[in-house]
Curated annotation (Swiss-Prot):
Disulfide bonds: none annotated. This is Arginine--tRNA ligase. The gene is argS. It catalyses: tRNA(Arg) + L-arginine + ATP = L-arginyl-tRNA(Arg) + AMP + diphosphate. Keywords: Aminoacyl-tRNA synthetase, ATP-binding, Cytoplasm, Ligase, Nucleotide-binding, Protein biosynthesis.
Amino acid sequence: MNGKQLVAEALQAVLPDWSLDDIDVKIERPKDEKLGDYAFPTFTLAKTMRKAPNLIAVELAEKIDQGSFEKVEAVGPYINFFLDKSQTGAAILQEILADPENYGARDLGHGRNVLTEYSSPNIAKPMGMGHLRSTMIGEAIARILAKEGFKPIRIDYLGDWGTQFGKMMAAYKMWGNDADIEKDPINTLLSYYVRINREAEEHPEYDEDGREWFSKLEHGDEEAKRLWSWFREVSLERFKKVYDMLDVHFDSFTGEAFSAQMMDKPIQILREKGLLVKSQGAEIVDLEKYNLPPLMVIKSNGTSTYITRDLATAMYRKKTYGFYKSIYVVGQEQEVYFQQLRACLKEMGFDWADDIVHISFGLMSINGQKMSTRKGNVVNLEDVLNESVDLARKQISEKNAGLKNADEVAKQVGIGAVVFHDLKNYRRNPIDFNLEEVVKFEGETGPYVQYARARGESLLRKSGITDFSDADLTKIGAEEWDLVSFMARYADTIQKAMETYDPSAIAKYALELAKRFNKYYAHTRILVDDVDEDVKKARLAVVQAVSHVIKSALDLLDVKAPDEM
């Protein structure tokens, strides 16, 4: 039983009309740890008990059975609980050590499907640093959902349809060199795309050429289909190489082209329900009652817009997966669009429209510079990951020249550093990326957290102890309690991250645990002869528990935890 449950049960004994759940949601953690481990505010009792909250706190504190606590005291309108450090600490450690992989997990999902769409790069263009945010936020959310008992279904909705591919084909037909494409397909195709956009300013006919090629693709022209399939194949091959580096794996790569085959159904429903309204030659859905701008469905030239594919996709996914939630990890510039998508689905009569969730995020800049594929100043993600690994390798060789499997550790540290930097920031905030800062072993970085755990693992190896089943875990003191009580917050942290779809809660937790452990490591004597053997073993059990929890937290962020660095 965790500390919060002990507090809830002690309170229910003196508040019999309250359920455990009602009490549980009111229990807080004091901002100042000197005020106790938990606090219960009495404001909501004032009306029924007809007393001032301060008096209620004093009265209840006197009635509470203090057997499981060091002390219970009233401070103003709050009842503050100080847990029995040795007994509660031993119980927390036992729970971690007994089943480290599942520590912190709560079966809140009961196996329900949650679709998570993320990454979604465009074919025939390299994955840039701009894709990192969607990819890693989405992957972390999927891992957090799995930890909480949901079944995440990971979807990479490839940008493999649209007028830009017509432009790519037109550019290829004008300037394409097959030898160059075979050698470096994506970067060569990108150079054509950048060139046609640049030169279209003086040659507007290039834009028309692009539209014609896309029209050919829509109507099944064999050459257009051949080029499209080729562009898609070489792109996906390259994307999977980057995903393997990041340890990201999808259940589906069906993209916009797949959805384009199903557009007739949503348009049919919109027509049958009389939702399509003529406006300046186009057809729109009026969403004024939702305080949203009108949604263009069919352009004045008769072609459908992006929304028809997204409507068709949402309908297909609900029918295929019966999802509990369908999450889209897409930049915050699309917020209004996803509100329109939900509103349109509601108008079409789908009661599951509110289960569509848009997880937005802020833009990433590189050393203060914005990125744009259209203008050609995209920063290649694969190049950044490789450079980060090289930097990590250099630092590791300086710290530990004789490290075995140094190359593998360099990959784990270098790639982990890039991922951790992305995820430690609240997802809606814009972030700036500076590689040298990101890979440092000091400060709020991934390598700092990884190194803290590696130090703990080194201590455990030196001790030679691998089994703590006979350890007297009540031998922990105040120094250990600082770590153990913080590890008890892990489950709440995971739940908060899940409810807010915010992996930064996990990253911040991992950083704080690493900081507390480093302080403990620096000030506590463990592997010395004059420390009592029972105390020594209890302290090593704490080190083992910290190692388990840091590894678990990093895994939720898709960051590796090397045992040596």
